[in-house]
Curated annotation (Swiss-Prot):
Pfam families: AA_kinase. Keywords: Amino-acid biosynthesis, Arginine biosynthesis, ATP-binding, Cytoplasm, Kinase, Nucleotide-binding, Transferase. One of its GO terms (molecular function) is ATP binding. It is an enzyme of class 2 (transferase). The record marks 40, 258 as: Transition state stabilizer. GO terms for cellular component: cytoplasm. Substrate binds at residues 75-76, 97, 197. It comes from Streptomyces coelicolor (strain ATCC BAA-471 / A3(2) / M145). Pathway: Amino-acid biosynthesis; L-arginine biosynthesis; N(2)-acetyl-L-ornithine from L-glutamate: step 2/4. This is Acetylglutamate kinase. HAMAP family: ArgB. Catalyzes the ATP-dependent phosphorylation of N-acetyl-L-glutamate. CDD domains: AAK_NAGK-C (cd04250).
């Protein structure tokens, strides 16, 4: 008579591959537990409804997995649309938006009143987690006028700021309370009583360094940093800060603030900075919790041989 413990074949459960995926994530969960990760939200992920929803899911997943996510956002597409609607001409110089006084009013309105509110709402569909603030709040970001150099000459690009000071107190208080800070890339002015538009890539990198973050993640509309664009679409999966510094002069203008941000972050003590394809749903989870990862990772020089 059988006791039910015969040598019958083990049933092949269809869910077993999911267990393997979870186990693959275990060492990464252990490594990142309790660590701060700053995520710059931008590109197509900001205007595609499915990508926005997936982004919110990823960030909330990080929070429940024991990480401390901080979201920094710009609003390029939304700002351009609003400026067109108000009949304000907008142009870019050195990869940065020229921001007149009139344009600054629109930038502030769109970032703090539209993009941030929508993102906070998406995150809070999963629980009372996200809190929105701008760099003005609690003096989180302070900036002075930024004048880039083009062909050897300083160029006036209006109310575009260069971050001079960061106060992480408000963000750290929110993280300690289990919240997800969502920061709009606007800074208070060190020079006058106005505000500055600051590049969101730059703001995210500066915040990551100031917070002592484990990781900076920058969402883009490309797969990562290409090895020899446009002659090759081979993505560089990993490089050191010094290797990146050598490549900077030859990068396209749109990638310069992103890669300069990554360089600043790792030189400022952030363990890794990653540029990932925001067009891929759940790219954040793929980058952090899988062996292969996705995109380009920048590491400090001393990690180059590891």
């Amino acid at each position: 008579m059988s006791d039910g413990t015969s040598n019958a074949p083990t049933r092949k459960h269809t869910a077993l591959p999911k267990a393997q995926i979870l186990i693959e994530a275990l060492p990464w969960l252990t490594r990142h537990h309790g660590k701060t990760v700053v995520i710059k939200f931008g590109g197509n992920a900001m205007i595609d409804e499915d990508l926005k929803a997936a982004f919110a899911q990823d960030v909330v997943f990080l929070r429940h997995a024991g990480l401390k996510p901080v979201v920094v956002h710009g609003g390029g597409p939304q700002i351009s649309a609003a400026l067109d609607k108000h009949g304000i001409v907008s142009e870019f110089k050195a990869g940065l938006r020229v921001t007149t006084e009139d344009a600054m009013d629109v930038v502030r309105m769109v970032l703090a009143g539209q993009v941030q509110r929508e993102l906070v709402g998406l995150l809070n569909q999963h629980g009372p987690l996200a809190v929105g603030l701008t760099g003005e709040d609690a003096h989180t970001l302070t900036a002075t006028k930024h004048q880039p150099e083009i062909d050897g000459e300083l160029v006036d690009i209006g109310r575009v700021g260069e971050i001079t000071e960061i106060d992480t107190g408000a963000i750290e208080a929110l993280l300690a309370d289990g919240r997800i800070p969502v920061v709009s890339s606007i800074a208070r002015s060190q020079d006058d009583h106005h505000v500055y538009n600051v590049n969101a890539d730059t703001a995210a990198a500066a915040l990551a360094a100031a917070l002592g973050a484990e990781t900076l993640m920058v969402l883009t509309d490309v797969e990562g940093l290409y090895e020899d664009w446009p002659d090759s679409d081979e993505v560089i999966s990993r490089l050191t800060a010094s290797e990146l510094e050598k490549l900077l002069p030859d990068l396209s203008s749109g990638m310069v603030p992103k890669m300069e941000g990554c360089l600043h972050a790792v030189r400022g003590g952030v363990t890794t900075a990653r540029v990932i394809d925001g067009r891929v749903q759940h790219s954040i989870l793929l980058e952090i919790f899988t062996d292969e990862g996705i995109g380009t990772m920048v590491v400090p020089d001393e990690q180059g041989e590891s």
